[in-house]
Amino acid sequence: MEKMITIIYPYRNRELNRITNSLNSLSTQSNKNFCVIFVDYGSDFDISESVQELLIGYNFVEYIHSFHNNQPWSRSKAINIGLRFTKTEYVFIADIDIIFHHNFIAHLFELKKENDNIYFQVGYLSEDESKKLKEFDNYNITSKSIPEGKGLSLFNLNCLLAIGGFDEFFHFWGAEDEDVHSRLIIAGFSPIFYNHEILLLHQWHQTFESLEHQKLTIQLGFSDAFNLNKKKLRFNQSYNILKPNNENWGKLISEDDFKILNSHLDSIILLNKKDVVENFLDIVLPNTKDRIINVVFKEDKYQSTLSYKIKSFLGIKVHDYYSLKQINDLLLKTLLIYYKDSQFNYRVSSDLKSVQLKINLCRG
């Protein structure tokens, strides 16, 4: 293995100025023995094109695009894809919001040990401070991360390979960093929290937990995502789960695979009746093999008629319905629990009046 350190950036659809600020701070490192693997996990095509143009100016960056477009964000999967391309002994998991101290790489070489994995305290910048361009030491820090915040870590690559990478169950945000360090402890590798000085600054952004998930939006999400991640974290910890992934972890979706799924144009319309939705989730989806399913869920127009409302008021038996928000939450939760290793395409229409799922259930 090369005597360098690899830095992995997991990325999707973030502002270009964040990339510039972060990579510029790497360009001025006192120690140049590093390379960057920039994993674009399904950004919109116009954004990914702009990112690729921007990265041309940084000769230490390798750009990788995985066509996880129209799938929920998974930092774990994005990192694992990067791990599959890593050729160095040590790897640092970065964040597009991070500004590095100019001696950060030099510190990594001083700190790395064979069996130790190090995670770093971070200085948080305010929204206003994040908009300013300053020398690292001149930024005003509003707060510092606590030991429970383990997202920015240096790992011995072999340690991560020994536990099968990050747990790919985790989607959206939360728990994947705490989980990977917990499993490394099970494997006998000790973590170290480095808080002697601030070497990393975090540019402000709205937190995932503060985003609105109680109503349907075109941005993929569901109400119980954070709690679901916490439950999986506690399960892994309670049962000393060392390697939660199958052997195919870190799988990149190629452009050809993406095109094959999206070339399937024939869709079936399913109304939002409870019995229809539950039949799809309980019977159709788990019992369909070796084909692509393409379904669109829409509201039954009868649900909004005067006839339906009168019958409901009078207690006359009518169909029960799910809202599209409820269908969204049921679908996404089912996909992430039972079909996380399948390729699928999931969209909420721009008018919020339909939800579409294409999923490839072919084996291999």
Regions found by a protein language model. Name each.
Residues H181-G364:
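C-terminal catalytic/acceptor-binding lobe
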Residues V91:
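Short aromatic/hydrophobic "clamp" motif used to bind/position activated sugar donors
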Residues N138-F155:
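A recurrent flexible, glycine/aromatic-enriched loop bordering the glycosyltransferase active site
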Residues F67-T86:
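Glycine-rich, basic loop-to-helix element that forms the pyrophosphate-binding segment
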